[in-house]
Amino acid sequence: MKRLLAAALALLAPPLSAQEEAALPPAESARTMVVLQTTAGDITVALETERAPITAGNFLRYVDEDRFDGMVFYRAMKLDWGDQPNGLIQGGTQWDPDRVLPGIPHEPTTVTGLSHTKGALSMAMGEPGTANGDFSIFLQDSTGMDADPKSEDPVWRNGYAVFGYVTDGMEVVQAIHAMPTDPDKGEGWMKGQMMAQPVKIVEARRLEPAASD
C-alpha cells in the first residue's frame, strides 16, 4: 500500500468538515505566517520555522525573493479512498531555471515531530536532498508519507518533509482540488493529474504579527 501511495503522491509526488481548518501541532513552537494569494482565493499557512528550520526557511526565501509570484498550482491528485475530498494539490516553480534554487537537506518527520495531517504543507522531491521550489498541500491525513525508521526502503525511512500547515483558506484548497484535470496532460502515472487550467499564485507574502497595544 505504501508503494501505491508513493506512486500516487510523490512528484517525479479524525475526519473534519469542509469548513474546518487543519489543526496545528499541540506543542508551541515558533511559526511564521504566509498568505498565498491565488486567483481562487487566499490560503494562509503557518510555517514551522523552529521545528523545520531548513525547509521552512527555504520556503520563506522563495516568498521573500518573489519566486512564487506568478507561479501556479498545476496538479490536483484525486484519491477515491478515505474521507473525501482526498488527495493533494501541488504548486511552485516547476523547475523554472529563473526561479528555482538548489535542493535542500532533507528534514524527516522523525526529526521535526511534524506529520502529514490534513492541511500539511510538504515538499515535493525525487529523493531526499532534491526538494527545492515545489510543494504539496494535503486534503486529508496522509501519515503514510511520514518517515518510517523501521522501513527497509530508504525512501520510506526518510519519508517526505512537512514544514507547515494551512490555518485559513482550506476551502480554497478544496476548490482548487475540485477543478478539472486534463486526461492528456502529465506523464506516466501522473497522466490525468495535471489541471486543465492551472491556478495562479498572484503573490506570496509574509503576514506580519499584529501590533500589540
Stretch-by-stretch model annotation:
Residues 7-8, 202:
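Intrinsically disordered, low-complexity segments enriched in polar/charged small residues
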Residues 8-9, 96:
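A periodicity- and composition-biased signal for non-globular, repetitive helical segments
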Residues 9-17:
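Hydrophobic h-region of N-terminal signal peptides that target proteins for export
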Residues 16-213:
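Cyclophilin-like peptidyl-prolyl cis-trans isomerases
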